[in-house]
UniProtKB/Swiss-Prot annotation:
Disulfide bonds: 3-24, 17-41, 43-54, 55-60
The protein's name: Short neurotoxin 2
GO CC, alphabetical: extracellular region
Tissue and organ expression note: Expressed by the venom gland.
Annotated region described as Disordered, given as residue ranges: 1-20
MF (Gene Ontology): acetylcholine receptor inhibitor activity; ion channel regulator activity; toxin activity
Annotated InterPro entries: Snake_3FTx (IPR003571), Snake_toxin-like_sf (IPR045860), Snake_toxin_con_site (IPR018354), Toxin_cobra-type (IPR054131)
Keywords for this protein: Acetylcholine receptor inhibiting toxin, Disulfide bond, Ion channel impairing toxin, Neurotoxin, Postsynaptic neurotoxin, Secreted, Toxin
Species in which this protein is naturally found: Oxyuranus scutellatus scutellatus
Entry function: Binds to muscle nicotinic acetylcholine receptor (nAChR) and inhibit acetylcholine from binding to the receptor, thereby impairing neuromuscular transmission.
Pfam families: Toxin_cobra-type (PF21947)
Family stated for the protein in its record: Belongs to the three-finger toxin family. Short-chain subfamily. Type I alpha-neurotoxin sub-subfamily.
Localization: Secreted
Length: 62
């Protein structure tokens, strides 16, 4: 599985997921800096107020 792993508005980068991980995620939230976006492998739990999208195809979390 290959997922994007860049933060917010950085240039696109990818990572190859290890350990049999078969999903990618994109988390979005707002704070005093504005909208923050985090991407990576897996499908982590999130706290209230954080939007999470999980998907199961290569590079699906842009």
């Amino acid at each position: 599985m290959t997922c994007y792993n860049q933060q917010s508005s950085e240039a696109k980068t990818t990572t190859t997921c290890s350990g049999g991980v078969s999903s990618c995620y994109k988390k979005t939230w707002s704070d005093i800096r504005g909208t923050i976006i985090e991407r990576g492998c897996g499908c982590p739990s999130v706290k209230k107020g954080i939007e999470r999208i999980c998907c199961r195809t290569d590079k699906c979390n842009n």
